[in-house]
Amino acid sequence: MAPKKPDPKKDEAKAGAKAAAAPAPAPAPPPAPEPSKEPEFDPSKIKIEFTPEQIEEFKEAFTLFDRTPKCEMKITYGQCGDVLRALGQNPTQAEVLRVLGKPKQEELNSKMMDFDTFLPMLQHISKNKDTGTYEDFVEGLRVFDKEGNGTVMGAELRHVLATLGEKLTEDEVEKLMAGQEDSNGCINYEAFVKHIMAG
């Protein structure tokens, strides 16, 4: 039997079939989005708007946290959040770490700050306090509206106010809810939020 002659047309078709069978190279993945960069906290850009009387009051509270042997008017970075909260602020731990410049865990108990370093942090936290809107509060109370009729049970609201989040005392709850319940013990929560926000 004579050897087969190469057939250029068949060879071309085979090569084309092999090329078609090979998977196309995967497209390059899109570049990862850059994390949104929050501007670094710069205490030198903070304008102090407290009155001299307020500053004296803050300084007094600050000294109560001073644990240095010679009362040097300094606190550790780790105490900063406690002092802010003692002064009526309610920052998250993430906010505290941000104004501190995101220190390492071991620096929290070793690095110290004086009152002049602390004051711009207090000013920044107090200015940026996230106060909820009317809609936020209504949405939060809607969770307890089991009937979907715009009311919540007064007893349930009392329980929530006294046991969750920043707990209120019984007296505070009673003052807040005075005259808000209807004859069935229910509270129209939209009217309740308006009442609270009006002060």
Curated annotation (Swiss-Prot):
Question: What CDD domains does UniProt report for this protein, alphabetically?
Answer: EFh (cd00051)
**Residues modified as N,N,N-trimethylalanine:** A2
Keyword Ribonucleoprotein among UniProt keywords: no
Phosphoserine (modified residue): where? S183
Q: In this protein, which residues make up the domain named EF-hand? A: 53-90, 132-167, 167-199
Annotated Pro residues bias = 24-34
Which segments carry the region annotation Disordered?
A: 1-44
The GO terms describing molecular function are:
calcium ion binding
Basic and acidic residues bias spans: 1-15, 35-44
Keywords for this protein: Methylation, Motor protein, Muscle protein, Myosin, Phosphoprotein, Repeat
PROSITE patterns for the chain: EF_HAND_2 (PS50222)
Post-translational modification Phosphotyrosine, affected residues? Y134
Tell me a GO cellular component: myosin II complex
Q: Which residues carry this modification: Phosphothreonine?
A: T92, T131, T133
Instruction: Give a short account of its post-translational modification.
Output: N-terminus is methylated by METTL11A/NTM1.
Subunit structure, per the record? Myosin is a hexamer of 2 heavy chains and 4 light chains.
Its job: Regulatory light chain of myosin. Does not bind calcium.
Q: State the name under which the record lists this protein.
A: Myosin light chain 3
Top-level taxonomy: Eukaryota, Metazoa, Chordata, Craniata, Vertebrata
